[in-house]
Structure formats: structure tokens, C-alpha cells
């Protein structure tokens, strides 16, 4: 029921009179839809940072890597290494310079998903910089040599 999902903690959108405001939760919900119908992709974590959460999935030739930086104050550097190098397709990142920011009727787009930066390629891995308090989805695609 839509009525139960509006104006409550962790709702996808809020109403304020005539206004319907998408929340950051909506953006996360939208970003994570790429995992529907996909298979979990196993991975090995080296030098695990307890403030970074990682999960990945694969659907056909598309690989999706989600990175969540739970630190309110520190950006994080992540190295992604694949057995066979896929091509980078796109990245989406949800963050705000102030983790306390929220969307309201006066500022409906203060915290919204943005196009993320392409990861740098160094040696044999992708180098990713995660903003503080951010959620990111990186989309890669298997290359012809991997199929």
C-alpha cells in the first residue's frame, strides 16, 4: 500500500502539501534494481576496511559492483581487480558534501544520485575513490575475449 510507504522513516518519497519529494532511499532503491534477476558474484577482499561494504552481481555479460562508504568524514580508495578485465560502462553515486543533508519541499534535489567518475586504470586494476557517506554502483561489461 502506497499510503504506508509515504512520510515514514526510510520512505522512498515524502509528501508536503502538493509536493512529492524523492528521498535518498528512493535513489538507493533505484540504483540497486540492477541486481534483480542477477546472480551473486563472489569476490575476495584484501585489506578489508570495516567502513566499506561491497557486494556484486552478474547478469548476462553485465557486472555490477556496489560500494558503500559508511564513514561520515573520510573518503576511501578502493582497488578492484578482475581475473579478466571487463570494460567500464558507467557509475552512479549517491552522496552529499554534508551527510546530514536531506531532501525537502524547498530543496527536493539536495541529495540525489549523480553520474559517478570513471575509475582510473592502473597496472592491472581499477582504482576507485569513494566519497564519504556514499553509495555507489559501478557497471562493467565482459569483453569479447571473456565470453
Each model region followed by its residue ranges:
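Ser/Thr- and Asn-enriched, surface-exposed coil loops between beta-strands
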Residues: 42, 48, 59, 74, ...
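Extended hydrophobic-aromatic, low-complexity segments
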Residues: 11, 39-42, 66, 74-79, ...
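Acidic, Ser/Thr/Pro-rich beta/coil linker or hinge segments at domain junctions
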Residues: 85-130
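Aromatic/acidic polysaccharide-binding cleft in carbohydrate-active enzymes
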Residues: 1-30, 34-56
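Hydrophobic alpha-helix feature that most strongly marks membrane-spanning transmembrane helices
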Residues: 1, 30-37, 68, 72, ...
